Regions:
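Terminal amphipathic alpha-helical/low-complexity segments used for targeting or macromolecular assembly
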Residues: 1-63
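Left-handed beta-helix
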Residues: 63, 68-69, 74-75, 80-82, ...
């Protein structure tokens, strides 16, 4: 468990030039939000929905990052700064970097899209500040989403998504 934490801290440190030590990374709200999410997701998967939402609520209050307990998150997610929202059916791969004020939002279930309402981010995706990725779309591996982009269609592998 300690080795996994050190690996996670190193993955964040490799993507952020600001921290001088792993100790600094331990203070990042994004790290705490992901940690609380892991607990909330476990409770959610065990059908303890109220407790899952309670942990989620506590995490949101402490970190200004809202990750629904139902969201599926891979290894080494780095949320750099707060005010990020990740919806219930969102799926995030490994080594994804999300900057501040990002929304992985859903579409209205009444629009005919059953089940999956939120985006899927594959491995090694980077999402710029203020981006809004909406609906049951896929952002493929190594894609980059520019700051303040509004993305409503699939983004191919290695592509850059900007604008509306």
């Amino acid at each position: 468990m300690v080795a996994a934490l050190i690996d996670y801290l190193d993955s964040i440190k490799s993507r952020d030039p600001a921290p001088r030590t792993r100790w600094e990374v331990l203070l990042y709200p994004g790290l705490w939000a992901v940690g609380y999410h892991r607990i909330a997701h476990w409770l959610y998967e065990a059908d303890m929905f109220f407790l899952a939402r309670l942990v989620n609520h506590w995490s949101r209050w402490l970190t200004a990052i809202d990750i629904h307990p139902g969201a599926k998150i891979g290894r080494h997610l780095f949320i750099d700064h707060g005010f990020t929202v990740i919806g219930e059916t969102a799926e995030i791969g490994d080594n994804v970097t999300i900057y501040q004020c990002v929304t992985l939002g859903g579409t209205d279930p009444a629009n005919g899209v059953a089940g999956k309402r939120h985006p899927t981010l594959a491995d090694d995706v980077i999402v710029g500040s203020g981006a809004q990725i909406l609906g049951p779309i896929t952002v493929a591996s190594r894609a980059r989403i520019g700051a303040n982009a509004v993305v409503t269609k699939d983004v191919p592998e290695g592509a850059v998504g900007v604008g509306v």
